[in-house]
C-alpha cells in the first residue's frame, strides 16, 4: 500500500515535467520497494564519485589502507565534488578496478566510459550501491562503508539539494549529487543519491534525470519526487509508531 501511494504521488509530481526520470527507493525494514524506469540509463556526472571511492576502497583493502593523499582526494571528491580529485582517483583505480567493483557489487547495468562523468547509470544499480553502503556484506568492510557515508554526510551546504528535499528533523542524511550540461548545454543531466536513517526507518533513494533545460529545472524535478517519498515514509512510520491505529495514510 505504501509503494502504491508513493508511486501515485511521484506520477503526480512528474506531471507536465520535461525531464526523463529514473527513480528507485527502498526501505528494507518497512518492506518498501518502489521504482520508476529504474532500469533506464542516464549519464552519471558526479554521481559516479561514490562508486569511484567504493572501488578504491575495494582495491586498497579498506579505509584503513588509504594513504593520507588518497584520503585528502576522497574528501575533496565527495564533500566538494572536486573533478580534479576524481580524475586522480579514477586513474588510480583504473577501468579494470572499476569493473571489478561493479562485478562484486552486482551492478551489472552500469556502463563504464573512459571519461568517468559519461559513465551510464541506472537508478536500480545506484540503489544497489546505496544498499551496499548501508548494509553488512562481503564487498566492503564496515569501516569502509562508514567512511563513505561519513563523507556523504559532510557534503557542503550548496550541494545538499535533491533527495533530501522535505526530510524531517532527526533524520540522518547522506547525499551525493551530479550535474552536467551535456552534450549541448541545453540538456542538463541532474542526479541525486541519498540514504536516510531516523526513528523507525532506514532507506535509500536514487533519482537520475535527463532532458532538463537548466540545472534548476532538473533539481526541481528531483525534489518534487523526493518530497513525495520523504513525506510518505515519514507519515507511514508515524502511523506505525502510534500503534497502527486509526486510518492508515493513503
Regions found by a protein language model. Name each.
Residues 45, 68, 107:
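Acidic/His-rich structured neighborhood in mature extracellular/periplasmic domains
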Residues 47-50, 79, 83, 123-127:
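Short alpha-helical patches at coil-to-helix transitions and adjacent helical residues
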Residues 36-42, 112-116:
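A short glycine/serine-rich beta->alpha loop
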Residues 1-21, 26-30, 89-250:
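Penicillin-recognizing serine hydrolase domain
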Residues 58-76, 98, 144:
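Short, well-structured active-site flanking segments
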Residues 31, 41-65, 77, 205:
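Active-site SXXK
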Residues 70-75, 82-91:
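Hydrophobic/aromatic-rich structural module bridging two neighboring secondary-structure elements via a short loop
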Amino acid at each position: 500500500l505504501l509503494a502504491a501511494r508513493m508511486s501515485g504521488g511521484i506520477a503526480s509530481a512528474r506531471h507536465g515535467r520535461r525531464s526523463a526520470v529514473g527513480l528507485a527507493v527502498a526501505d528494507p525494514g518497512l518492506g518498501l520497494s518502489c521504482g520508476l524506469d529504474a532500469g533506464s540509463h542516464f549519464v552519471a556526472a558526479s554521481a559516479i564519485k561514490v562508486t569511484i571511492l567504493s572501488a578504491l576502497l575495494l582495491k586498497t583493502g579498506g579505509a584503513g589502507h588509504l594513504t593520507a593523499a588518497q584520503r585528502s582526494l576522497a574528501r575533496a571528491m565527495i564533500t566538494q565534488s572536486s573533478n580534479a580529485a576524481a580524475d586522480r582517483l579514477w586513474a588510480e583505480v583504473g577501468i579494470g578496478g572499476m569493473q571489478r567493483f561493479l562485478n562484486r557489487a552486482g551492478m551489472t547495468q552500469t556502463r563504464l566510459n573512459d571519461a568517468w562523468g559519461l559513465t551510464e547509470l541506472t537508478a536500480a544499480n545506484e540503489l544497489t550501491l546505496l544498499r551496499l553502503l548501508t548494509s553488512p556484506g562481503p564487498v566492503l568492510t564496515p569501516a569502509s562503508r562508514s567512511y563513505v557515508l561519513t563523507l556523504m554526510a559532510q557534503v557542503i551546504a550548496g550541494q545538499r539539494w535533491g533527495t533530501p528535499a522535505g526530510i524531517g528533523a532527526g533524520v540522518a542524511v547522506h547525499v551525493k549529487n551530479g550535474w552536467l550540461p551535456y552534450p549541448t548545454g541545453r540538456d542538463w543531466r541532474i542526479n541525486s543519491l541519498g540514504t536516510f536513517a531516523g526513528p523507525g526507518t532506514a532507506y535509500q533513494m536514487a533519482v537520475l534525470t535527463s532532458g532538463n533545460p537548466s540545472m534548476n529545472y532538473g533539481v526541481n524535478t528531483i525534489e518534487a519526487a523526493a518530497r513525495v517519498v520523504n513525506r510518505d515514509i515519514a507519515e507511514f512510520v508515524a502511523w506505525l509508531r502510534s500503534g497502527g491505529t486509526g486510518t492508515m495514510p493513503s
